């Protein structure tokens, strides 16, 4: 561990400065002294100070060379010449070629999926490709299918946003008006049938939305995926590629997956094998759990730069319309005539409030009734059960919006839990 009160780092062309922060109260300040540099595709402004805190894993890259001033406590800090950024910018150039053709012929722009096992830098590559697209005047859509470590909405959901400007260096992309669908589990294995149904619905709605704006239509979609790439996880990748009509699949750091996709996807789909960055860090189960918790906490409370002040209010059991998607599995022989066991996986069932509901995150659906297409309806937001009072027949909810719940509010159960100990 080194404490750095201020040091200039001189980077040659095509190199990057990497550092990690693991200490809870540590703070690192970075500024660009001279030259040109970028963080995951976002250009750094000269002399502006950028602040990074605990959990930050940063790689600042320069094409032409630069000097960076860095101060603060870091667990690791070094300069590397071994970087895949040139291959990544070549991927952007290929996508840009597709976009120019799409613009000329008034067609859909490229739909590119980024796939690979856990901890290879999938979301980082998505961020780089999106930033480069925006910097040349495009307006792509970003679809995040990673229900375990999503970067748009909280875990347990899939989401899409329109990218109109480069990501903020410290905070990432603006999460304005996301299209969010509820899944309710931390992995597609929680309910494979439901996961495919939700991905298909979001793909359908997203592709339709491309027609409403010519610039977005030709800009296309960048898709982030889960790190589960074997067995059923691989089947989910194939399903997503088909649902979105992917024309390019970027495979990070796994030749086996690359060769399987070459074999199984239609011939017109470009499958490209890419190296992962040496700066990618493997995360333990505990770190993943902490990251999920942090995303939920930020949803309700914001961060130090932009704090939110959520509301707590009581809802009586009789006013709570709470449901879960997916009934307990039954053998085909026990199912009604014409139904299969997998139909149970997408069944909407009522949930009776019990003390077991405490700390669970609930999604507020735009559906007004269980007679509606609940699975195919996006969600307005989330709340969390902080208290269950069986005596008073009421629950206490933590919500970004004040009471009451909207009329006919339909809440959907999630296996995700959040301990609200914010002070």
Curated annotation (Swiss-Prot):
Keywords: ATP-binding, mRNA processing, Nucleotide-binding, Nucleus. It is found in: Nucleus. The keyword Chaperone does not apply. GO terms for cellular component: mRNA cleavage factor complex; tRNA-intron endonuclease complex. Coiled coil: none annotated. ATP binds at residues 16, 57, 119-124. One of its GO terms (biological process) is mRNA 3'-end processing. One of its GO terms (molecular function) is polynucleotide 5'-hydroxyl-kinase activity. Pfam families: Clp1 (PF06807), CLP1_N (PF16573), CLP1_P (PF16575). It comes from the Eukaryota. Required for endonucleolytic cleavage during polyadenylation-dependent pre-mRNA 3'-end formation. Belongs to the Clp1 family. Clp1 subfamily. This is Protein CLP1 homolog.
């Amino acid at each position: 561990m080194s404490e750095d009160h201020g040091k200039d780092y001189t980077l040659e062309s095509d190199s990057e400065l990497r550092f990690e922060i693991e200490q809870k109260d540590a703070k690192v300040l970075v500024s660009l002294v001279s030259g040109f540099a970028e963080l995951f595709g976002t250009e750094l402004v000269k002399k502006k100070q950028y602040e990074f805190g605990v959990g930050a894993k940063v790689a600042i890259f320069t094409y032409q060379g630069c000097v960076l001033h860095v101060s603060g406590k870091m667990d690791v800090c070094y300069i590397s010449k071994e970087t895949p950024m040139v291959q990544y910018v070549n991927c952007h150039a290929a996508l840009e070629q597709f976009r120019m053709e799409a613009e000329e012929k008034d067609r859909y722009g490229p739909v590119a999926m980024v796939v690979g096992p856990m901890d290879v830098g999938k979301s980082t590559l998505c961020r780089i490709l999106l930033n480069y697209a925006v910097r040349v005047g495009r307006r792509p859509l970003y679809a995040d299918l990673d229900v375990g470590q999503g970067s748009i909405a909280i875990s347990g959901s899939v989401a899409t946003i329109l990218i109109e400007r480069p990501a903020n260096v410290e905070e990432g992309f603006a999460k304005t008006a996301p299209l969010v669908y509820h899944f309710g589990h931390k992995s597609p294995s929680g309910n494979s049938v439901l996961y495919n149904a939700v991905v298909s619905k979001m793909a359908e709605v997203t592709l339709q939305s491309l027609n409403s704006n010519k610039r977005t239509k030709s800009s296309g979609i960048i898709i982030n995926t889960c790190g589960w790439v074997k067995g059923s996880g691989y089947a989910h990748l194939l399903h997503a590629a088909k649902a979105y009509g992917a024309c390019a699949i970027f495979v990070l750091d796994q030749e086996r997956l690359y060769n399987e996709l070459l074999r199984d996807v239609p011939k017109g789909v470009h499958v490209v094998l890419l190296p992962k960055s040496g700066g990618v860090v493997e995360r333990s189960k505990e770190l993943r759990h902490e990251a999920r918790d942090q995303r939920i906490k930020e949803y309700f409370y914001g961060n130090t730069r932009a704090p939110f002040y959520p509301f707590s209010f009581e809802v009586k059991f009789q006013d709570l319309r709470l449901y879960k998607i997916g009934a307990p599995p039954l053998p085909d022989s026990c199912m009604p005539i014409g139904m299969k066991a997998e139909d149970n996986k997408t069944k909407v069932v009522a949930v009776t409030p019990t003390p077991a509901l405490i700390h669970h995150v609930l999604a507020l659906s735009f559906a007004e009734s269980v007679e509606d297409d609940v699975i195919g309806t996006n969600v307005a937001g989330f709340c969390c059960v902080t208290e269950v009072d069986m005596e008073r027949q009421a629950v206490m909810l933590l919500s970004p919006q004040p009471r009451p719940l909207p009329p006919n509010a339909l809440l959907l159960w999630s296996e995700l839990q959040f301990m609200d100990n914010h002070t």
